[in-house]
């Protein structure tokens, strides 16, 4: 498998998820500003966005490899199968992350503005992870990406 396709899946999936989270925040549905939340764990508010963006994309590329491993286990035969499997992995990942976000991460965040993570924030992250999985699955299906075991 070519590393290029893993990176492509990660970048496009992370971009789609970031856009979805930005849209949710912009529309006032929930405070889903994940990029600044990630960055503000490490640095001050002035550079939180750029730090969070770099971390988010690096993790997104690494997680894309894991998604592609799981997608390959199912040996999908069509674009719909790739996309559906990606979305299901995103759903499971989103449920796990939303739970951790509400129970653990928000409680210990250094910034007060990110400590209030209720149902809306959890659902926003769940949706963001489903979008990520959809896009990773779609790109994997377009290029018929498989990790051979």
PLM feature segments, named:
Residues 1-149:
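Juxtamembrane/disordered regions of integral membrane proteins
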């Amino acid at each position: 498998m070519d590393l290029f396709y893993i990176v492509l899946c990660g970048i496009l999936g992370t971009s789609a998820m970031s856009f979805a989270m930005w849209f949710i925040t912009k529309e006032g549905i929930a405070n889903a500003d994940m990029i600044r939340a990630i960055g503000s764990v490490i640095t001050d508010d002035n550079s939180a966005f750029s730090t969070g963006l770099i971390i988010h994309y690096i993790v997104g590329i690494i997680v894309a490899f894991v998604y592609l491993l799981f997608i390959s286990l199912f040996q999908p035969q069509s674009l719909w199968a790739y996309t559906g499997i990606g979305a299901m992995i995103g759903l499971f990942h989103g449920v796990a992350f939303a739970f951790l976000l509400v129970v653990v991460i928000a409680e210990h965040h250094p910034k007060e503005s990110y400590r209030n993570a209720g149902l809306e924030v959890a659902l926003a992250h769940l949706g963001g992870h489903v979008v990520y999985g959809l896009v990773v699955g779609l790109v994997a299906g377009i290029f018929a990406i498989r990790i051979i075991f």
